[in-house]
Every structure is written in C-alpha cells, then in structure tokens.
Amino acid sequence: MAVYTEVTDEALAAFLAEYDIGTAVAFRGIAEGVENSNYVLRTTGGDYILTLYEKRVDPNDLPWFLGLMEHLAARGITCPQPVRGRDGQALRMLCGRHAAITGFLPGVWPRKVQVAHCHPVGEVLAKLHEAGADYAPTRLNALGPEGWPPLLAICRSRADEISPGLGEELQKALDRVLTAWPSDLPAGHIHADLFPDNVFFLDDRLSGVIDFYFAATDALAYDIAIALNAWCFESDHAYNITKGSALLRGYNAIRTLTEAEKAALPVLCQGAALRFALTRLFDWLNTPPGAMVTRKDPMDYVHRLRFHLSAPNAGAYGL
C-alpha cells in the first residue's frame, strides 16, 4: 500500500455522499507498499480502507478482484469486503482514479517473521486456493512469465546503476527460468502477493489476508513459491528451512502437493524471485520524487534468486 494521489477533504466528502457509511472523522495515508494509493478512513459509521487504483492495475480487472474477495469471504476466508454505494456499485471515480472502499480488518502484520507465523500462512494459502476453485471468472497473470521479458527490457540499460553486472545476471536467469518453466501444473486463482504485510495476526492467530490486486489465475504452486520467497528468508539473505518446512506443512495439511508440483518447486521459486526483482527494479528506477511510497531494494530478491538457482530439488525448501 502507498499514496500516489492526494485526496482533498472536499473530494472525500463528495465521494462519501454516495454511501451510507457516515461522514469522515479521520483520514490518513498509508505509506507501506508500492502499487495503489491507500488511506485509513474513519467515519461516523466505522473504520474502512479507501483505495485509489494506480499504475499496473487495469481498471477492467477491478470487478474481478472485488468479486473474488466477496467470493472468498463467503467461503470462510477473512479478507476485506467491498462496500457498495447507494447505487449498488463498489467502484466509482475519485480524483481521476477508480476507487473503492473496503472494510477494515483488525490485526497487525508481523514485522519480524517467526516460525510460528509460517504454518498458518501455509494453511490459509491452501484454504484460499480451495475456496477460489468455484469462482468462475478467470484473469491472466499479467506479471507471469510472459510479462518478465518486457520488464527486463525496460530496465536492463539502467540495472547496473543498482549493482555492476546486474542486467546481464538477470538476463541469464530469465533465459534459464523461461526454458524450464512448467506448463501443466494444477491451476486456479492465486493471491500472487502473499507477503507479511498482507497477512494480519491478532493475539498470535492469523486474522486476515489483504491486498488481492495481483490475484490471477495461474499455477497454484507458483503462489507457494511466492510465499516461500516472502516469508522464509532472513535479513542476511539466508533461506530458513525451518520456516519453509512449517509453511509447506501448513499448506499440505489442507491441500496435498502433487509430485509434479514438488519437482517444479525450485524453478517456481526462481521465477517468483525474478518477478519481484524485476518489479522492484522498475519501481526503484521509476518512482516519482516525493511520492509517499516505500521503495524496496531489488537486490533482496536477486540474493533470493541466486539461492534458488542453486537449489537441487524441493528438499532444499524443507519439503
């Protein structure tokens, strides 16, 4: 989450007039994240999140995202629910951006990931996959393998500003990953961004999952690879196999991985690390000055990528 578009008090008041949730009492931007403009909104009717959609989000995809959240919540996944206006619509325009209000989930995300967090994260990811199985609409993963070559092409000429030789290293990794990428794994709807700041805990229990705006239809095990990258590396870039094992056990307790998924885990993790290295590289080089957004170091994911390229099999992840 982040803030790129500033919302005036007058614009907010006019926007809220379309809803039955009261008038604004407090309103503040959220600096964490990199994609959309997000605000915590307190009204006389309760607490909410206001999101203005920016950058990579295609407005045509927004009904799919909001529909998925409603679908998952109806099947027991605790996630934000879109708030519909008096006209029954969840989407409308604000300050030149498509915008929506969702409910506020209690809890905090873990600033320091512990092993105890990882098992419930694996569980909720598997539950999410199962709950989404009967959501009929599909959405192409725009940041899947087909999206990586154009991203690298945009950034390669400046990649060495981050680290000498980085452009060539990423190109070699991309060529290797695309050659080995599996095409026949079990597929469904994936979260695709299950980072610690998108998972809330309350009283040491997982209390909710947020930020479905990268969700797509893709290989389910790719979502696991994203989660392993996000939850199971230490600050010194070392993979924590104890955390990885806990996450994988949690997932397998709900949905058992196939042998093909297990065999593909190293290349899926390579692809996941490459995807986030590339998007972070793009954002690092292109974030507008003064934006209320936290830039994230692409090298964190380059280090992860190097680990995955050396991983011989799924056993390296604790499976």
Curated annotation (Swiss-Prot):
It is an enzyme of class 2 (transferase). It holds the Pfam family APH. InterPro entries: Aminoglycoside_PTrfase, Homoserine_kinase_II, Kinase-like_dom_sf, Pseudomonas-type_ThrB. The keyword Kinase applies. Its EC number is 2.7.1.39. This is Homoserine kinase. CDD domains: HomoserineK_II.
